[in-house]
């Protein structure tokens, strides 16, 4: 075996045999070691090319390894032949592979033995090899040593000191930099070698076309012990390298797959996003189209509903009730159906109550009394010209029509049935009664007479509510004359009117029906007693004229008479059904028929209208709550009504009112009546007025001229109105007989001073209305100083003097230019159509009062255009009053409006308005003031008057040297700006909060009709006291100036000469011109506390000034009403 190994080693180191192509050349002849070596080299070449060994070569190689036995057993010849055969097999190599496959099966037993022999050889080599390192390890060790040496040298060079010579230092630095460039050098060398190899090997690809087997990895030959440990280590390294490359390739592939999946995932997301982006506009477009379609459908539906509403509204205005009801059914509007059903129930209930009223007498007849002719329905049916329709009886044709008609059509038929029920007995009036001698009735007055006669025939009562100035008095006289002439109803009739208009009633009876016995029941108790003794015994009268006061005072006498007709002029006096007058007339007097005359049936609310209806028909309109709920219930929670619902409510209410209320307007019946134009003239305030206005709004008190003491005020709204009128209203003892100061201290007086001379020169006559009688006194002083001819009528004017005053003013070529009237006393029932200009000095919270005053001139008989001037202080509380008045006028224009159902307007809102006025203070005073030219344009009725007014203004400016027209701050007396700290000391036990929102007690005035039950118990002896007797003496100021009566002050100033700065002003001596002028100590405001419903918009809760102390005012009375409650 050792010989074999040595032979193999010798073969390895021996020079290789020449190989030509793929053929192994084995020499013949001698055999021996050279031949074996050549055989082994050929086999090695085949194995290196990864080619299978031919069986002969395999057998020869095996025989070489098995050596002696094989070779010795077979003999020398046999061995040479086998070697030659192996060499030939190797030479035939690839070409005769087929034959090798066939021979391999025969040599398989020897092959197994060869494999075993090679394994044993390898084990022996591994066992006997000494300690050594592989080539790769040696190379790595060498590299490590080399790198360590270089690193050591770098450290050594870096640590060398710099004190060496220059040459040595340079060499060390060069060596150091060279060593540091080692890595760069390796990289450059590697790159250059790679480039060189690529250029060399790949420059000519066509030359590299050879057997691809040569490109395979050359493994070192280690079979059969040929090779060394270095070859095996290299094989191990290559194997590990291939494994790591495979692992890297797998990782790279997995990474690529993950990247692919990731990209695919994000690609899917992006694709989904792109699809979503494409779908969103499409979806939005589809949604928009759908929404547009829905919106267009709703628009078309709303347009269709609006068209139907407009059509229904037009049909409702036209009065086509059947068509309207059919359209309501088609629209399926539940709100309208509910409203129709509720109001239909009201109309049916009223119709039944009316029928019951007609069947019975309104008031039980006293024993022994006889019915007047024509008073019963059965008797009236026999009168020629009467048409009787029983609501319970219907013709067969009507029954058939009702049978075929729908039940819903009764909603509107209820209104017709109510009208026909009330006026089922009709009597045509074609001519006026012959007893009327004063003139001819107008057509609309004949219609009014026929309407009142229809109520009489049907045993019902009513309200004649014609607009003021249309002759309600004449129509009433015509009714009495007709009843006397045609029905033989001689009375007696009771006519109740305000005291101011009693002379007018008496004059109208004398003028139009002198044959009717009329008594004016007024005067002192003795006079009235004489009238009763003379006329009541034999009943030598037909009509008794009296006023509200005597109805209560002479109750025990007047209630004994069985009155046939009760006629109440200015019937809105009964707008409170709980007042003493209404309760007394209903419960204590015996009355068969009732008739109310009023030009303003609705002043503030639906409650007032019900009160009037309740007075005339208490059995029908017996519940105020039900009356309001009938119209309020359908929309108790929804107060906003559209135009159609509001008009329907108005229409249905008209159906309720139409049978009992007749109202005509001037523009409807009097087409030739001159127009009435209202002009609002705004004026500024003087510095004095602004000072007082600011004091009232800031601390609720004003400074007086008596010892520089201020005074706490009550009823702030009234105090602010006084500030707007004139500052003299606060300083009672101030010397007002100064010609210039009385004008310059008030903006309204300054405007009046410019306006009155122009109106007088233009030939106009003026009615001037004010609510404050004390202001009328100041106006009197002004008119006397400037020598204007005037008259005055207020609550203190006696009844017998009022007729004379009216006659003197209305007579032809009367010398009187101006008539001073109080709004409350002079605005009712007076005929002053000879004047064509009305000046409202201060507006009332209730616009109807101003309307009544305006219509004193704008009435039948007026031939000139009527101009109404309303004076308003800019930025003050008067603008709020004007705005509220405009809102209230809408109630009368529509008779009823949605605001009447609105119960949210409470006292809190009114209190908030007062607080807003006080908070605003004087910030808006004096803004938006018209110029003189604008005022002239508003006041002039034509261009000629305008240029006349312009000329008069220029003359006045030149005469006054262009001085300021209003008082400036430096001209105001110093005591006006006195500090409030100088007020009187207040006891410690008095409360510190002063109630400022209270109102004064109602003072006694002649026209006043707000009397309670105490008048029924009053003794007649009280009447013996003069009416103008002085009242309880007020506490005087704590100053040297004593309280003096105005008449005494006039006497003291009778010979006073005006010593003003202007020397051109002549001497003036006051004269008492007007008739019936009372002393100056009368009430400063005849009715500054208004009726309950219109007291003031600012009423409704206490408003206190905490910075003030309570101080008993010597200027006003106590601030609580008769029930002890504070009121504003």
Curated annotation (Swiss-Prot):
Residues 1084-1093 have a biased composition (Acidic residues). ATP binds at residues 466-473. Residues 91-110, 353-415, 1076-1097 are annotated as: Disordered. Its main location: nucleus. It catalyses: ATP + H2O = ADP + phosphate + H(+). A motif (DEAH box) lies at residues 569-572. One of its GO terms (cellular component) is nucleus. Residues 356-376, 400-415 have a biased composition (Basic and acidic residues). Residues 751-912 form the Helicase C-terminal domain. Belongs to the helicase family. This is Probable ATP-dependent DNA helicase CHR719. It comes from Oryza sativa subsp. japonica (Rice). The gene is CHR719.
């Amino acid at each position: 075996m050792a010989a074999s190994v040595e032979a193999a080693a010798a073969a390895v180191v021996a020079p290789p045999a020449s190989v030509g192509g793929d053929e192994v050349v084995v020499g013949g002849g001698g055999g021996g070691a050279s031949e074996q070596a050549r055989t082994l080299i050929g086999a090695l070449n085949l194995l290196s090319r990864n080619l299978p060994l031919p069986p002969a070569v395999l057998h020869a190689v095996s025989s070489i390894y098995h050596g002696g036995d094989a070779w010795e057993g077979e003999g020398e010849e046999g061995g040479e032949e086998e070697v030659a055969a192996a060499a030939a097999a190797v030479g035939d190599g690839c070409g005769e592979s087929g034959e090798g496959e066939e021979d391999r099966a025969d040599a398989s037993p020897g092959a197994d033995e060869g494999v075993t022999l090679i394994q044993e050889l390898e084990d022996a080599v591994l066992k006997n090899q000494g300690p050594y390192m592989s080539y790769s390890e040696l190379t790595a060790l060498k590299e490590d040593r080399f790198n360590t040496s270089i690193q050591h040298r770098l450290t050594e060079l870096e640590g060398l000191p710099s004190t060496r010579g220059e040459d040595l230092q340079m060499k060390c630095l060069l060596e150091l930099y060279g060593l540091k460039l080692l890595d760069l050098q390796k990289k450059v060398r590697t790159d250059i070698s790679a480039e060189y190899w690529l250029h060399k090997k790949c420059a000519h690809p066509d030359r590299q076309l050879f057997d691809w087997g040569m490109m395979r990895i050359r493994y070192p030959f280690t079979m059969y012990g040929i090779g060394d440990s270095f070859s095996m280590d290299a094989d191990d390294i290559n194997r590990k390298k291939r494994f790591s490359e495979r692992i890297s390739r797998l990782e790279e592939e997995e990474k690529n797959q993950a990247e692919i999946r990731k990209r695919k995932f994000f690609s899917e997301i992006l694709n989904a996003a792109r699809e979503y982006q494409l779908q969103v506009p499409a979806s939005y477009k589809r949604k928009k189209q759908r929404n547009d379609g829905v919106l267009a459908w709703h628009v078309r539906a709303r347009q269709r509903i609006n068209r139907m509403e407009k059509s229904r509204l037009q049909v409702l205005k036209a009065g086509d009730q059947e068509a309207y009801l059919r359209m309501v059914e088609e629209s399926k509007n539940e709100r309208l159906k509910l409203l129709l059903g509720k109001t239909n129930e009201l109309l049916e209930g009223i119709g039944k109550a009316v029928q019951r009223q007609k069947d019975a007498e309104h008031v039980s007849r006293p024993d022994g009394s006889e019915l007047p002719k024509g008073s019963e329905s059965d008797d009236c049916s026999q009168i020629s010209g009467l048409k009787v329709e029983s609501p319970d009886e219907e013709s067969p044709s009507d029954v058939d029509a009702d049978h075929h008609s729908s039940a819903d059509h009764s909603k509107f038929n209820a209104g017709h049935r109510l009208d026909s029920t009330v006026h089922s007995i009709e009597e045509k009036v074609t001519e006026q009664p012959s007893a009327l001698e004063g003139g001819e009735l107008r057509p609309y007055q004949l219609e009014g007479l026929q309407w009142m006669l229809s109520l009489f025939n049907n045993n019902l009562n009513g309200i004649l509510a014609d607009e003021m100035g249309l002759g309600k008095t004449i129509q009433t006289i015509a009714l009495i004359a007709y009843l006397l002439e045609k029905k033989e109803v001689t009375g007696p009739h009771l006519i109740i009117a305000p005291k101011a208009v009693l002379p007018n009633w008496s004059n109208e009876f004398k003028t139009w029906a002198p044959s009717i016995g009329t008594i004016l029941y007024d005067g002192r108790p003795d006079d009235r007693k004489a009238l009763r003794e003379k006329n009541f015994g034999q009943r030598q009268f037909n009509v008794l004229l009296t006023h509200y006061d005597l109805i209560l005072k002479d109750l025990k006498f007047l209630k004994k008479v069985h009155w046939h007709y009760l006629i109440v002029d200015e019937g809105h006096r009964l707008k409170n059904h709980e007042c003493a007058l209404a309760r007394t007339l209903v419960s204590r007097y015996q009355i068969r028929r009732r008739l109310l005359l009023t030009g303003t049936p609705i002043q503030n609310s639906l409650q007032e209208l019900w009160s009037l209806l309740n007075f005339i028909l208490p059995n029908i309109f017996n519940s105020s709550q039900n009356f309001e709920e009938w119209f309020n219930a359908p929309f108790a929670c929804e107060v906003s009504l559209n135009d159609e619902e509001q008009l329907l409510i108005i229409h249905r209410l008209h159906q309720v009112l139409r049978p009992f209320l007749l109202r005509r307007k001037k523009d409807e019946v009097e087409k030739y009546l001159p127009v009435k134009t209202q002009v609002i003239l705004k004026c500024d305030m003087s510095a004095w007025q602004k000072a007082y206005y600011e004091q009232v709004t800031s601390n609720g008190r004003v400074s007086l001229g008596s010892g520089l003491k201020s005074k706490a005020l009550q009823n702030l709204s009234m105090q602010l109105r006084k500030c707007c009128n004139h500052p003299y209203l606060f300083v009672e003892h101030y010397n007002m007989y100064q010609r210039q100061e009385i004008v310059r201290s008030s903006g309204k007086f300054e405007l009046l001073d410019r306006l009155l001379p122009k109106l007088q020169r233009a030939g106009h006559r003026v009615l001037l209305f004010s609510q404050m009688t004390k202001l009328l006194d100041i106006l009197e002083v002004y008119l006397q100083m400037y020598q204007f001819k005037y008259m005055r009528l207020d609550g203190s004017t006696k009844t017998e003097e009022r007729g004379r005053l009216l006659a003197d003013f209305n007579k032809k070529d009367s010398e009187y230019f101006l008539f001073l009237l109080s709004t409350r006393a002079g605005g009712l029932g007076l005929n002053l159509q000879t004047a064509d200009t009305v000046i409202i000095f201060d507006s009332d919270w209730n616009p109807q009062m101003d309307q009544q005053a305006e219509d004193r001139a704008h009435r039948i008989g007026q031939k000139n255009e009527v101009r109404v001037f309303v004076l308003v202080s800019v930025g003050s509380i008067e603008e709020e009053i004007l705005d509220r008045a405009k809102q209230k006028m809408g109630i009368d224009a529509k008779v009823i409006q949605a605001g009447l159902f609105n119960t949210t307007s409470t006292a809190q809102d009114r209190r908030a308005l007062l607080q807003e006025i006080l908070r605003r203070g004087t910030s808006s005073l004096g803004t938006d003031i018209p110029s003189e030219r604008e005022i002239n344009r508003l006041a002039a009725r034509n261009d000629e008057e305008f240029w006349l007014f312009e000329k008069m203004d220029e003359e006045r400016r030149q005469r006054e040297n262009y001085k300021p027209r209003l008082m400036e701050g430096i001209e105001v007396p110093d005591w006006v700006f006195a500090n409030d700290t100088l007020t009187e000391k207040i006891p410690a036990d008095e409360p510190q909060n002063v109630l400022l929102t209270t109102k004064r007690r109602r003072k006694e005035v002649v026209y006043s009709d707000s009397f309670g039950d105490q008048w029924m118990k009053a003794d007649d002896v009280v009447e013996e006291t003069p009416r103008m007797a002085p009242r309880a003496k007020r506490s005087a100021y704590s100053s040297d100036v004593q309280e003096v009566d105005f008449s005494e002050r006039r006497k003291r100033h009778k010979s006073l000469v005006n010593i003003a700065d202007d020397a051109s002003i002549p001497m003036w001596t006051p004269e008492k011109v007007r008739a019936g002028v009372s002393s100056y100590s009368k009430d400063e405001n005849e009715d500054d506390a208004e009726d309950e419903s219109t007291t003031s918009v600012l009423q409704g809760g206490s408003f206190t000034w905490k910075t003030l102390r309570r101080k008993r005012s010597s200027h006003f009375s106590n601030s609580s009403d008769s029930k002890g409650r504070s009121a504003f």
